[in-house]
């Protein structure tokens, strides 16, 4: 295999699944921090109210991250989470500075574009979506 040739057939879809799982699990931790204070919030942060914008974001992070990690309804979940991260960046990070490295918005941008990629690519081979598609194909 040359570094200039694409990877052999099974690996791109498998690595897409690994990226999806790792992204989903990391995203869940942002939500659990907001909803359950686990891992603990930085000192001096007030508790998050569940029905506030941040609380609803935490709910989306936990349940959307879980669905995304499992590969369940990946495309619609990724669409919602990508939009949420765009809102997060432009509402909370961008007003602080134009530069993402200064305004601490790099994770929001990365999550936004990773999710946007999955809107178009799908979940990959190791996902509930793929299992559902295989079972539907077997019935036909």
Predicted regions and their residues:
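Perimembrane loop-to-helix junctions flanking transmembrane segments
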Residues: 42-55
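Extended, low-polarity transmembrane helix blocks
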Residues: 1-36, 52-59, 63, 70-140
């Amino acid at each position: 295999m040359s570094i200039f040739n694409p990877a052999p057939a099974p690996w791109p879809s498998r690595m897409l699944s690994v990226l999806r799982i790792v992204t989903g699990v990391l995203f869940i931790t942002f939500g659990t921090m907001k909803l359950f204070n686990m891992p603990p919030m930085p000192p001096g942060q007030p508790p998050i109210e569940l029905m506030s914008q941040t609380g609803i974001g935490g709910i989306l992070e936990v349940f959307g991250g879980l669905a995304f990690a499992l590969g369940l309804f990946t495309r619609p979940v990724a669409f919602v989470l990508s939009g949420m991260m765009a809102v997060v960046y432009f509402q909370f990070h961008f007003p602080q500075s134009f530069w993402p490295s200064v305004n601490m918005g790099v994770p929001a941008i990365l999550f936004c574009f990773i999710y946007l990629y999955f809107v178009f690519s799908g979940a990959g081979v190791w996902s509930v979506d793929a299992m559902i598609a295989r079972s539907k194909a077997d019935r036909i």
